[in-house]
Each structure stands twice: as structure tokens, then as C-alpha cells.
Amino acid sequence: MHAGLQFGSRFVVPPMQGMIYDYLPEHLLERVRNLGAFAGILALDKWTCNANGRQATFWKRSRERKFTVSFIDQGYCFNAGEWSFPDSPLRGVYARNDVYREVSGWESFQPWLGNIESMDEPTIWRCAEEIPTAWYGESCELERLVEILGRRRARVAELILEFRNSSRAPFPKWRDVVN
């Protein structure tokens, strides 16, 4: 890290009001209230070419039994600041298949996949305009990134299928629907 504008975030739950875990054993995953969000973040990671394994924290307030998953560290999106997109089926995925065990088909990726696919370029631009200039340098670089993200919207489902068909076989409940 070097001097300049940096990003920091708050705790998802204040330390005196709950617990935060970076790992939950498989038997506790049934107590994660938003486990389906792993499908949503997978769609985002495929769209943005997250070159790192997906990182997550699980948290709960002191008196709660259920956990909530929050996704952290998007620093390797756009191939770790290279702003290139060398796709690979196992890029940007969580290390354990059990978080994907309830994925049963394309409906499991909604509304996230639909939102990505239908996002128009002006919306992408509104998000991009929030990025500090110091983080990207030349405006032509930001323009290039927005153009690439616009084109990649149509590829996200294909990239998810590549992961589905990979040696990991992450979606045991996936069923193909034949019309």
C-alpha cells in the first residue's frame, strides 16, 4: 500500500454485540439465513473477473442463532487492478462447494444475474463515476472498463456454466429444464 485514498469499511456487527467468523463448518451452513447470496456474488465475480477466491465472513448478533454471510475483499476484481479479464472456471469462486449446494438452476441466480444482464451502460457509468480518479489514472482507462463490463453482461451465464461443468461439480442439485 502507498499513500493516497484508501477504502475501509466498518464491522458488520460491533465486536461487543456479536461474533464474526471467517469459517463455518458444513453443519452450521444450514443456519446461514442468506446462503443463496453465494449464487449472487458468483454472478458478480464472474462479471468482474475476480481473480481471487471469493472471501466471506459469517456473523451473528449475540442472542441470534442464525448467521448472515457478508462478502469481503473485492480487490482482485478486474484481475487485481490489471483491468484485464482472463476468465477461468475456478476464478472468483468460494473455496468450498457446500455453499452452492442449494443451487438448482438459473432461478437460483435471480435476481442478481438478471440485474447484471439488464443493466444499461448509463447505470454502469453512474457507478464508475464514483471511483476516485487516483484509482484509475486516465479517463480512457475508465471508459475502456465500462465498455468491457457492458459487453461482459451477456457472458456471465456462460461463465457460470463453465464453473458448473468444471471438475469441481459445484451444483449437485442443478437440474436442466427441457422445453
Report residues per predicted region:
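Bulky hydrophobic/aromatic packing residues
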Residues: 5, 9, 37, 156-160
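Residue-level signal for well-ordered alpha-helical segments
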Residues: 18, 24, 28-33, 101-105, ...
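Short, structured active-site "lid" loops
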Residues: 1-16
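Conserved kinase catalytic-core segment
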Residues: 20-83
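Generic structural signal for residues positioned in beta-strands
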Residues: 7-8, 53, 70, 148
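C-terminal catalytic region of ATP-dependent kinase domains
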Residues: 61-179
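Short, functional N-terminal and low-complexity linear motifs
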Residues: 7-10, 23-25, 92, 113-117
